[in-house]
């Protein structure tokens, strides 16, 4: 593959619902352009794109893959992204480097949740978008039904540019709306424009009017011409369509069948005709380390900025960093600087990646995508620059992992391998997080969902030889008291020689203003010498680490040393510490201790039609609805819910909302646990200690 510069490169993110055929569309392009000698299939393990063992096992994309296609003396870097929602981190990284979007739609179910999410994301990022309705050669599919569903859901910007010609239930060709010509797939008619079938002329005229109207909306001169009934010239129409597609005002619809290579050539032609090259983007904004915004040309003449959007950590090869050159030229055998941390990086070699294959390259020009190996100080979202010209690209925003599971090694031999594997996988995946909880003594791993963590567990085993077991993480309950009580503690021990003696009276009272135990003293007349006050406080703090009900930490308690006795010879710090323990034990029988549970602030965003179901489910979780705010066609629900009832919420919310609901949560406070839940927690705690 030759070098391509910014005016020859297009970067297209391929997005859509899982199973719509995104990878198959790209496999068909590879095969059609003779980049491969066979049509690869994930399920057979022959795919050039989905080649990882996890992808073969599941039969779907798990990772983002770069698929460069050479077509019409240009290079299209397709970024194949997973459609399954658990792998959204891979999708977000891949989507960020695409300058345009190709949404692949399943003709049998055109409005799947992944299609809606893909379009929503493309609109939010203002990226030119094309729809490809796939699998139209399968039974019970209809182009018209699929197109109408898309137009009704997403608006008048969705317009067909080609319509399939169907004879006896089979797609035999297509009609190009703008050119008003038909093309047939039979060998004798291939690449020969033909008249539009008479039965389709009315339909084609209607679609051409839709295109003309959309073009007119973006140009005052053409609008006047449109409403006066004049037809646009071919040049006016093509120019208007290009502008409309690039502004997001027109979303062309194409169709076909990836597995039978129907419509694939026409789709590549459409992408070349209407999607912008990287240089046509014009400018992009970078930021200096001091926070100053700088406008840069998307050109090879500009200073170098190259952003890492994906990292792979291999136990044998090391770190592989996928980069997009946003400006300037990245050269092999050069030294650059990481603008995010100021550290130098040696660029030993650059690779052009095509699925599972890599080819060495001397340079990577503006707009192009490649891979670097063994960078020492660089991670995903970092920007590589020329020395002395440090500029950072806007960071890619990744979802926060919410689904947590405690992880333990299966055997002692797995401990070191597990620790190493978790550290490496965090470098690789921005949506994977590891938290060591000192209170529960658990290591908790967080991901987007259960399938995400399933992939993590399999990678720990296959890549790092660490077998693990997952379980629900323990909830960090708390205990407190609801009544003021005085406890007496008298520690006396005589065993020959010096004995041990300490005697204290301690008041325990609720103190909602301070989480940690507060210690005070009101001792009069030297009943307890001051030198023993720290020992009493230490003893009380030790006791508060384990509450009387279930052994959870005591909070919101004020302790006051009131009185006591000492012995000139037998008293010691240890004796008074033990006396404090006994006073605590005595007081807890009278202070009415209760169990507290963590309450989470939860912010949920769902389409309107799911609001009722989500609120009903929150009520079942003992949640309180704090408010609702309309956001576009969604509702944002603010709620407070006990943490104990949120352990699998990411999976269950996805099920309730067909994948369209999202949420975030953070700790707010501790509240009393009502019965009978408190008794269950206390009973379970006792069983764990047996």
Q: What annotation goes with each model-predicted range?
A:
Residues 1-690:
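Structural and coupling elements of P-loop NTPases
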């Amino acid at each position: 593959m030759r070098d391509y510069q910014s005016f020859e490169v297009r970067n297209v993110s391929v997005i859509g619902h899982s199973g719509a055929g995104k990878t198959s569309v790209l496999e068909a392009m590879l095969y059609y352009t003779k980049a491969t000698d066979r049509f690869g299939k994930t399920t057979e393990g022959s795919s050039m794109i989905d080649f990882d063992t996890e992808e073969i096992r599941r039969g779907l994309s798990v990772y983002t893959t770069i698929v460069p296609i050479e077509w019409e003396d240009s290079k299209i870097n397709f970024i194949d992204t997973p459609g399954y929602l658990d792998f959204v981190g891979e999708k977000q990284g891949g989507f960020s480097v695409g300058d345009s979007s190709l949404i692949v739609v399943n003709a049998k179910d055109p409005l799947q949740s992944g299609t809606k999410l893909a379009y929503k994301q493309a609109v939010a990022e203002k990226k030119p978008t094309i729809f490809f309705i796939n699998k139209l050669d399968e039974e019970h599919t209809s182009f018209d039904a699929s197109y109408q569903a898309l137009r009704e859901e997403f608006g008048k910007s969705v317009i067909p540019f080609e319509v399939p010609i169907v004879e006896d239930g089979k797609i035999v060709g297509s009609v190009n709306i703008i050119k008003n010509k038909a093309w047939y797939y039979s060998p004798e008619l291939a690449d020969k424009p033909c008249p539009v079938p008479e039965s389709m002329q009315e339909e084609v005229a209607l679609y051409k009017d839709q295109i003309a109207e959309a073009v007119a909306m973006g140009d005052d001169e053409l609008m006047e011409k449109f409403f006066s009934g004049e037809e646009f010239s071919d040049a006016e129409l093509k120019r208007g369509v290009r502008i409309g597609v690039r502004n997001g005002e027109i979303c062309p619809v194409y169709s076909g069948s990836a597995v039978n290579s129907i419509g694939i050539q026409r789709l590549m032609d459409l992408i070349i005709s209407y999607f912008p090259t990287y240089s046509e983007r014009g400018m992009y904004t970078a930021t200096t380390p001091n926070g100053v915004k700088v406008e840069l040309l998307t050109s090879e003449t500009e200073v170098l900025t190259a952003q890492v959007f994906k990292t792979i950590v291999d136990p044998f090869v090391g770190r592989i960093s996928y980069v997009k050159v946003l400006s300037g030229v990245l050269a092999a055998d050069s030294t650059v600087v990481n603008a995010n941390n100021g550290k130098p990086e040696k660029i030993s070699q650059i690779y052009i990646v095509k699925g599972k294959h890599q080819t060495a390259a001397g340079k990577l020009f503006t707009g192009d995508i490649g891979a670097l190996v063994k960078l020492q100080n660089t991670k995903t979202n970092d920007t590589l620059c020329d020395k002395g010209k440090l500029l950072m690209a806007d960071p890619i925003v990744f979802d926060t992992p919410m689904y947590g599971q405690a992880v333990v090694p299966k055997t002692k031999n797995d401990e070191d391998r597990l620790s190493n594997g978790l550290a490496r996988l965090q470098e690789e995946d921005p949506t994977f997080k590891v938290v060591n909880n000192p209170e529960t003594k658990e290591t908790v791993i967080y991901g987007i969902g259960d399938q995400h963590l399933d992939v993590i567990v399999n990678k720990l085993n296959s890549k790092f030889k660490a077998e693990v077991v997952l379980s629900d993480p323990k909830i960090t309950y708390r205990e407190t008291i609801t009544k003021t009580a005085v406890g007496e503690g008298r520690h006396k021990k005589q065993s020959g020689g010096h004995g041990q003696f300490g005697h204290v009276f301690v008041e325990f009272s609720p103190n909602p203003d301070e989480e940690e135990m507060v210690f005070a003293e009101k001792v009069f007349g030297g009943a307890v010498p001051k030198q023993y006050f720290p020992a009493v406080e230490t003893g009380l703090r030790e006791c508060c680490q384990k509450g009387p009900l279930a052994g959870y930490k005591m909070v919101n308690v004020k302790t006051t040393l009131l009185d006591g006795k000492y012995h000139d010879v037998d008293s010691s710090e240890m004796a008074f510490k033990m006396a404090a323990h006994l006073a605590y034990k005595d007081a807890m029988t009278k202070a009415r201790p209760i169990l507290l549970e963590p309450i989470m602030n939860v912010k949920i965003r769902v389409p309107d039609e799911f609001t009722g179901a989500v609120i009903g489910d929150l009520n079942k979780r003992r949640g309180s609805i704090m408010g609702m705010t309309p956001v576009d066609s969604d509702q944002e629900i603010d709620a407070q819910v006990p943490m104990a009832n949120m352990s699998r919420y990411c999976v269950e919310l996805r099920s309730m909302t067909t994948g369209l609901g999202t949420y975030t949560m953070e700790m707010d406070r501790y509240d009393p646990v009502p019965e009978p839940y408190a008794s269950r927690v206390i009973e379970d705690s006792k069983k764990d200690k047996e």
